[in-house]
């Protein structure tokens, strides 16, 4: 029912795939929306766009930095799905876009990290997707509620809440 949906849970504006065409159209300044976002989100998104813009500048001799480029150093791989993320849309860049909101949850959905394959007492076993590593303190969206990880032992995750269903998709945030 519509009264149980999140009608104002908009997806994140992501125009990173359109940077080249925006530069070609004459755009010289990009604003990163970070209102009400935490430091990790802003750091990740700015680093991601910096990386995308640097690749465009390096591959096109007609482009140059507007000022002396600084050396940007970060000890992570920028990825918008790794911090608060409800899906991405370019909104109205090329006309009306379907599915600009995530009506099912106001929470960050992150990326799919695996599937619950077993539950034992106060822990769950997740079959992780290739390349996924979890750490104590990571956030996970499980079913609709999600939980924080108290402890990791191999494939076993000890959440801070009781879980009860096997087979659910697990999404890391």
Regions found by a protein language model. Name each.
Residues 1-173:
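Surface-exposed amphipathic alpha-helical tracts and adjacent flexible/coil segments at the periphery
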């Amino acid at each position: 029912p519509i009264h149980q949906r999140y009608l104002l849970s908009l997806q994140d504006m992501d125009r990173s795939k359109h940077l080249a065409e925006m530069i070609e159209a004459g755009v010289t300044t990009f604003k990163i929306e970070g209102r009400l976002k935490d430091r990790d989100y802003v750091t990740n998104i700015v680093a991601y766009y910096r990386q995308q813009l640097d690749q465009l500048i390096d591959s096109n001799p007609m482009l140059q930095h507007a000022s002396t480029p600084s050396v940007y150093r970060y000890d992570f791989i920028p990825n918008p799905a790794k911090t608060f993320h409800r899906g991405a849309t370019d909104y109205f860049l090329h006309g009306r876009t379907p599915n600009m909101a995530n009506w099912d949850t106001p929470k960050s959905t992150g990326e799919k990290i695996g599937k619950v394959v077993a539950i034992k007492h106060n822990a769950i076993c997740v079959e992780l997707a290739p390349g996924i590593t979890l750490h104590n303190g990571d956030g996970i969206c499980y079913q609709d509620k999600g939980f924080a990880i108290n402890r990791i032992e191999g494939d076993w995750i000890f959440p801070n809440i009781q879980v009860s269903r096997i087979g659910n998709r697990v999404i890391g945030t």
